[in-house]
From Swiss-Prot:
Tissue-specific expression: Expressed by the venom gland.
Keywords: Neurotoxin, Secreted, Toxin
GO MF term list: toxin activity
Protein name per its UniProtKB record: Scolopendra 4511.92 Da toxin
Subcellular location: Secreted
A GO CC term attached to the entry: extracellular region
Organism listed in the record: Scolopendra angulata (Barbados giant red centipede)
Family recorded in the similarity comment: Belongs to the scolopendra toxin 1 family.
Predominant location: secreted
């Protein structure tokens, strides 16, 4: 999801 990546990068990608 959008909050999965560090500092809401790109859908955890």
């Amino acid at each position: 999801s959008e909050t999965d990546s560090a500092x809401x990068g790109r859908n955890g990608q």
